[in-house]
Structure formats: structure tokens, C-alpha cells
Amino acid sequence: MKSNFFFIFFSTLLLTNASAENLFIQSKNISLDKNREISIFENEVLVRTEENNEIISDYAEYDKKKGLIKFKDNILVTDNKKNKIEADFAEYNDITKIFKTNGPTKILTNENYTIFGEDITLNNKLKIINSNKKTVITDQDGNIITLNKFEYLIEENIFKSIGFIEIKDNQGNST
């Protein structure tokens, strides 16, 4: 019985340490807040995730216990498919592999679609980018698509939406 307990204990310990090594964080200034048990990163913050996504910002707070990083100011995410996300407030959960923005967000997809919205989520496990807020998408030809919510399938480069959809083409026609 003791050997089973120790095996489970050491297995859990090894798995916990392995998951912490999948996140790379660097910045010019690093400090610790012992009261809140977080690490604070300032000036040229760079985070690389296990999925090889890169997150750059001016400021980040990392709570290792929760696996949560909060970002502020000049955030730029480049995912492994070369989609780019810009925002001023966001957080990344290293456990669930979900990146969420708070407030206005701009996305440039790898196929040159520009997306303006807010409160956008990048789910690395499901390989989707989505929002339940009003979103405006502009394609390479200048056509404008307004949606109440959307889902972008990263692997297939496909947009999906249910509900209100308005399309204005580059000639001024709309539907």
C-alpha cells in the first residue's frame, strides 16, 4: 500500500514539474510579489507556450499555482499558424490552453482577414478563435462582414456564425 502511495505521489510531482517547463517567460524586469504569490514581468515581456504561440506585452503577472498569466498593454499574440491577435488586456491559462482578451481586439488571420471585436478567445485545444460579441471582419478585397458572434476554425481557415450577419461588398452593396 505504501509503495502505491509513493508511486502516485512521485508521479503527480513529476507531471506537475513537467507541465511547468512548457512555458517560457522572459522580460527586462522581473520581480516577485510574495504576498500575492505571483511573478511580475515588465518591459518587453515574451511568453512562449507549449503550442509554440508567442505572446508579447509590456506587462504580465504569472500565478504559477493557478497556471494563469495576466497581460496588460501592447499585447501581440502570434499563434503557430501565423494568426496575430492585438489587445491591451488579456489572460492565458496554461492549464486549459485558453487565451482570452478583455475589451477591444484586432486579429489578422494568416489569410489576411482583419477582425475587429472584443472579448475574443483563442482555444488552443479546440483550435478555434471565437467571440460572442459584435465583430467586424474585412477580407482581402475590402468586403465588410458584421456579425453578432463568430467562430474561426484555425486548422481549416473557416469562419462560422449563427444569427445576425450583414455583408457590405467593396462596391457598396449590402445584404
Residue ranges: model-predicted function:
Residues 4-16:
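Sec-dependent N-terminal signal peptides
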